[in-house]
Amino acid sequence: MRRHLQFGIKQVHSSYLDGRLSPHLVTEQAVKDALSLRTLNAFIRLTPELALLQAKESEERFQEKQPKSELDGIPIAVKDNFCTANVPTTCASRMLQDFVPPYNATVVSRLRQAGTVLLGKTNLDQFAMGAGTVDSIYGPTKNIWSEDLSKDKWRIAGGSSGGSASAVAAGLCYAAIGSDTGGSTRNPASYCGVVGLKPTYGLVSRHGLIPLVNSMDVPGIFARSVNDCVKVLNVIAGPDSKDSTTIRQPFRKLQLPEVDQINLRSISIGIPKEYHCLGLSPEVLATWTKIADILECAGAKVEQVSLPHTAASIFVYSILNQCEVASNMARYDGIEYGHRALDERSTEQLYATTRAEGFNQVVKTRILTGNFLLLRKNYQKYFEKALRVRRLIAEDFSKVFETNNQAVDILLTPTTLTEAPLFRDFSALSNRDQCAVQDFCTQPANMAGIPAVSIPVRLSQNGLPLSLQLMSKSLNEQLLLTVARWIEAQVSFECLESGQLQAAEQ
Amino acid sequence: MLRISNKIRFYCKIAAKSDLKSKLDFTQLRHPTKVPQQPEPNAFPDLDNNTDDDPIDSKTIQLLERLSLVDLDSEEALKTLKSSIQFANRIVDIPTENVPALYTVLEKQQLQLRNDSVTEGNCRQEILRNAKITDEDYFVSPPGNIPLEQQNE
């Protein structure tokens, strides 16, 4: 009898329509669950009053049989680097601890127009600089799949959008918004066992997303199924007059075929050999191998391809990231908004002290390194050079996607090299090494601006999610997510099966 | 109306399991695999031991601190800076003759321009609300044109 309640947004929506469920009740439950799982530290700030008010409005719309969309009344969480009108937006930093934006990011306002309920703002690495959600002034986010949530024995959620991933994985909301500059959506999705989509660069507006690396940043989507992910994408994607870097052609809403209608016989899957790098765990390798095999069994053409500049990508990414960070962070001076130090000796002194107090070591070092790489004597050697190699990396992709007779439609790779690491092992590494290892497979897609999705496949020996990544050419989300949906149906990964969640429910 | 309870989740798990297809066997393959079973040789050998050539002197550090308006406040930070520069050095030998820089992946599309007219505004109070110190309708800063005081000369 309750079969229709298997947590897909579609089923919740139809239950709202026929009155078996109500947005208010679902939201109340979500708030309660979020409070009872506070130990995860997924949220920087819950917005229960706002959420319940929005849920009530949604409920009235359903009573009048006039829901705004399929997402009406669905609780959603947003990473705390997206501006939310009159709700503090901190970037998990002291610098923006008291910042209250007067406006909504486009992603947030489109979700509002669709009638979603904002459950709260989620945790991240300070200014989204990290791969673990361990560098937040509000403390680290824990992974719901951890064997043990106590002391230092828990697993990291991944990052930088770890709070959003953790919230979806723990069943606190149906979807969440993150951002993805080098893998910040796909990496935590991989560790937390949820779907994580990085759309084509320019498909989703960045207006109101506090910038990290403008030439790579995209809003990302977390959901427990590919179908739910598509519903969110359909609401937030498309041109925006407030972001001149959005792609101008109108967005055609995606509509995925039913699983049994998906025909893989005309689809060509590429396995880029360079993505088997040192440090890839045997379990991830076996997962990658098996999924390539079942795709081939289903009739897809599977072939090995080469993206020769892959290994250079992480270095190029690191250079461009630090250069753009040095420039982007120049806006924080304490005068117009954000933290202001008590130092009135001079303007420069105020700026310096404000920034010394407002940024953590990771942010400061990236600014200093970025400015070193941008020095007049270094500009050609590092910054320009990195942009040239970036073109080679992007061309690697266009060659495999567009070479006439051998073109592939989809690339299949690991997302992360391992299962979610233990906090104590991860925090023993420097931030640079954390990112260099964890972003190996994810950041090339940001270099080329192409869409990529991480989907959970199975559990490791330790009972932790193992995920794979699919990539395709720009604006090919329809095919990318169709293949993702097919794999999802074959592997039957259960997003809400974690032991900690079951313990919390008793 | 159904009461939402935690039990629903539990129910869903059972419901999902009942029609679960046989779990995949990850050791069985039906085709010769295209996935490389050995790692690709690393094109960028680890240079981290090579810390001798000091790329950065104290004058440069002072310049960086002035440009960045953040302080390089510890040995640890200096070490990270040096190792980040070495990390960046890994790409300098990649041949890029006649390869133009890729500034944006949207280079083939025209940037959207709008008419030079006011479309929104009248939000002075909202903007000033986030400043810590204001005077009437102004932001306030301490005296300018005074160079940053730097220690560790």
From Swiss-Prot, chain B:
InterPro entries: Asp/Glu-ADT_sf_sub_c (IPR036113), GatC (IPR003837). Its main location: mitochondrion. Keywords: ATP-binding, Ligase, Mitochondrion, Nucleotide-binding, Protein biosynthesis. It comes from the Eukaryota. It catalyses: L-glutamyl-tRNA(Gln) + L-glutamine + ATP + H2O = L-glutaminyl-tRNA(Gln) + L-glutamate + ADP + phosphate + H(+). One of its GO terms (molecular function) is glutaminyl-tRNA synthase (glutamine-hydrolyzing) activity. Its EC number is 6.3.5.-. GO terms for cellular component: glutamyl-tRNA(Gln) amidotransferase complex; mitochondrion. Residues 31-55 are annotated as: Disordered. Signal peptide: none annotated. One of its GO terms (biological process) is mitochondrial translation. It is found in: Mitochondrion. Subunit of the heterotrimeric GatCAB amidotransferase (AdT) complex, composed of A, B and C subunits. Allows the formation of correctly charged Gln-tRNA(Gln) through the transamidation of misacylated Glu-tRNA(Gln) in the mitochondria. The reaction takes place in the presence of glutamine and ATP through an activated gamma-phospho-Glu-tRNA(Gln). This protein may be expected to contain an N-terminal transit peptide but none has been predicted. Belongs to the GatC family. This is Glutamyl-tRNA(Gln) amidotransferase subunit C, mitochondrial. It comes from Drosophila willistoni (Fruit fly).
